[in-house]
């Protein structure tokens, strides 16, 4: 396996040839980022700050979950127990995906640019009809250093120039729509529609 290091100003992003997959394990007894198989995966904490590179809406089967809506999220951690400056991918469903979608909608309504934010993903415990589970709550903040700003710029370059898609994990899924860009064209934010 080869690894590429993408450099932009002060930011360095490690890009593995094979997608570096992280599971958002929302099972009642776990509630953490997990690397590796569910039964022997390495737990990597309940929160991380990250830069989102790209999101893709999917529908289908993943693991034991059948015919669900999924959000494939490509990101670069900037703090927490996940390896920093490494391009990773995870898949969100139900409440965790809805929480990120709701935040994205609020950004659009307020005329903000998601590409200029560092996000915090935090597991929070919930009670459901079938017992307790965890969901990922999303918040955001402005970049706090030049390196974080450079990392946001690097994420935009990667989004526009790399064909990011985890085909192996999503072989039992179909694309719901074109990739979801994390910001609207400037003309759309002023009320005009643009065609792609």
Report the location of each language-model feature:
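Generic N-terminal initiation segments characterized by hydrophobic and/or small/turn-forming residues
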Residues: 40, 55, 97-100, 111
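Short nucleic-acid-contacting surface segments enriched for D/E, G, S/T with interspersed K/R
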Residues: 100-120
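OB-fold/S1-family single-stranded nucleic acid-binding modules
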Residues: 117-156
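OB-fold ssDNA-binding interfaces and closely related basic DNA-contact patches used
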Residues: 1-83, 128-129, 141-145, 149-150, ...
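Long, charge-rich alpha-helical interaction segments
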Residues: 168-172, 176-179
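Short acidic, glycine/tyrosine-flanked loop/strand segments centered on an H-E-D-like triad
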Residues: 74-105
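Acidic, low-complexity/disordered segments
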Residues: 155-163
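N-terminal start-of-chain detector that recognizes signal peptides
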Residues: 45-47, 90-94, 108-111
